[in-house]
Amino acid sequence: MYINREIDHILLDWKMSDRHKPLILRGVRQCGKTSAVRNLSQQFGDYIELNLEKEPGIGKIFEGELNMNKIINRLELHFSKRISSGTLLFIDEIQECPRAITALRYFYEDRPELYVIAAGSLLEFVLDGKKNDTPVDFPVGRVRSIFMYPFSFTEFLHGTGKEILADYLKHTDFSETPNDAHQELLEEYKIFLTVGGMPEAVREYAETGSIQACQQIHRDIILNFKDDFNKYSRNVSPEIIRKVFDYATHHVCSQTKSSSAITGVSAYYFDLCIDLLKKAC
């Protein structure tokens, strides 16, 4: 079940625009980027999706000369499908192939009749060279970046069947909010704080109403998040990042001295890990 997101309108406006630069959809893992693009794909007659993480070998299509005609031919052979004018081409997990990021420039310059969206997480590490030791030749001015986030409270209300309350929230200035409406908003907000804004958890709550099931989803997401720590930097071990992450989650809103926060972790590495975690989000 796809729950409508606020970004859907932005993506649709991009489709309708005469000058549609390739899009880079950025955001933390599992915030709904892929689902949003697949939902948009229903507005296109032809759609091709390639995932550079699931199919690492497909990245070879972008090796060598970035000749768009040759790249399109390779894609057509790979998918056994013609790529004609108006096709939506979705390059998912593009951070796995820096060369594909550079290629977006030439999609814009040489094949403007195609609609191209790239999505990825941890892109900041690739763009500054922290992952591959070499900064990416980013196509400045030839692409448009959009940041996607987890569900907002308004999106949560719409997704859980509280459309009337969501519309009320959108149009009220809270100067004359009836007590019953205010109380209902508070109750729903408490639920939102518990369920969170990750799409899988919101979908689970909308379908089952089970907070316990949502908490299991949260645990799975955190484990997956930690599994990515080895991708953050070659200059700090994943174990140190994990220690700082665990420390931070238990000291929210508290004052901390980085020099004495965690035994065995210097102020330099503590601050470095905090910066890496912020960049990942």
Regions found by a protein language model. Give the residues of each.
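N-terminal pre-Walker A segment at the start of P-loop NTPase domains
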Residues: M1-M16
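Hydrophobic anchor at the beta1->P-loop junction of P-loop NTPases
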Residues: L25
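Conserved lysine of the Walker
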Residues: K33
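Hydrophobic positions on the alpha1 helix immediately C-terminal to the Walker A/P-loop
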Residues: A36, L40
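Short glycine-rich substrate-engagement loop in P-loop NTPases that contacts/grips substrate
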Residues: K54-S85
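Structural recognition of the conserved hydrophobic beta-strand(s) that form the central parallel beta-sheet
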Residues: F90, Y115-S121, F147
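Short regulatory helix/loop adjacent to the ATP-binding pocket of P-loop NTPases
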Residues: E124-R144, L157-K162
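Interdomain hinge/linker elements that couple catalytic modules in large macromolecular machines
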Residues: H158-C281
